[in-house]
Amino acid sequence: MAIINMTDLDLTNKRVLIRQDLNVPVSDGMVTSDARLRASLPTIQLALDKGAAVMVMSHLGRPTEGEFNNEFSLQPVVDYLAKALKSPVRLATDYLDGVEANVGEVVVFENVRFNQGEGKNDEALSKKMAALCDVYVMDAFGTAHRAQASTHGVGMFAPIACAGPLLAQELDALGKALDNPARPMVAIVGGSKVSTKLTVLESLSGIVDQLVVGGGIANTFIAAAGFNVGKSLYEADLVDEAKRLVANARSRGGDIPVPTDVVVASEFSPTAAAKLVDVSQVSDTDMIFDIGPDSAEALAKIIETAGTIVWNGPVGVFEFDQFGKGTERIARAIADSKAFSIAGGGDTLAAVDKYNIADKVSYISTGGGAFLEFLEGKELPAVAMLEKRGA
């Protein structure tokens, strides 16, 4: 990929506009989870260290486009950055027709979604943004799958468009996992529905040596194997699709293993009594909420021998501890593995946090939808734009 990297550029006295993902939860004017902000700090600091006048933009939440709404203002983010950085930080609310930005300071543009035309990648808006800078830096992998004015259009018209360090790291890690993976390659795909992950399953089943399914997705594969799933969440209309995926995997010498034992309950609640049963003994009133210890150990053995691991989604309802043992065993196996491992997706990151294995995973992807679309083999518009500008 012929993408220009920000790290390679001379930014002395340059006006540098960085698109970051500063979309964080805010309550009573305070940032309540700062993971994305912490991840963004090194890029801002690097631009400052390189002698640039730094401008930063992001979206926050889902306001009505084109309308200011104080609930979605980036002011709490500015307050956070002002404390975290040793440089002056200020918010610019009216910036499209020009903004003063001095070397050594950070100007944060108000929520890009307050601009009419942001979502539609409006050309006039994109050109106005591009006119504000000498260098545009795309550093928000989490929004790279959206062709919008602040993630795509501006980069088409800016004098120089490049990838920031966060985006470059993400693309390197995903490339390492998918383009030329160390074998055997194992993918763990969980979540509630096959329908939302069907293209991911199809794409991965063609490149991995072992595809492991969990959560509600696994229930559809259990049904496809001819077992009763009781009242469990599953998709009857996709049973044939599951059979086809298994047949495809086996024709390549791989497999999509179905659990041999499962943890069931009669209701979905934090206090539901968990019962371990053989997969052939699920009753009509049971709901499957986790894989059993035998299945978890079998999957752990697969993970132990892997060269590359891609993890997207838990294998059970791990939010309730009595249904979390399967996901915990998988998480520990990934943590103990010597393989190159990459984890992504909201629920997956929550599991990584719960079992405290963040420092044992090779790379944690910040992008939810973008991570999935990359796994599906789709072209990400922002990445395509950077490749075009770098060519």
Swiss-Prot record:
Signal peptide residues on this chain, from the entry's feature table: none
Keyword entries, A-Z: ATP-binding, Cytoplasm, Glycolysis, Kinase, Nucleotide-binding, Transferase
EC number: 2.7.2.3
Entry's Gene Ontology BP terms: gluconeogenesis; glycolytic process
InterPro entries listed in its UniProt record: Phosphoglycerate_kinase, Phosphoglycerate_kinase_CS, Phosphoglycerate_kinase_N, Phosphoglycerate_kinase_sf
Enzymatic reactions: (2R)-3-phosphoglycerate + ATP = (2R)-3-phospho-glyceroyl phosphate + ADP
Family: Belongs to the phosphoglycerate kinase family.
Protein name, entry field: Phosphoglycerate kinase
Species for this entry: Shewanella denitrificans (strain OS217 / ATCC BAA-1090 / DSM 15013)
Gene of this entry: pgk
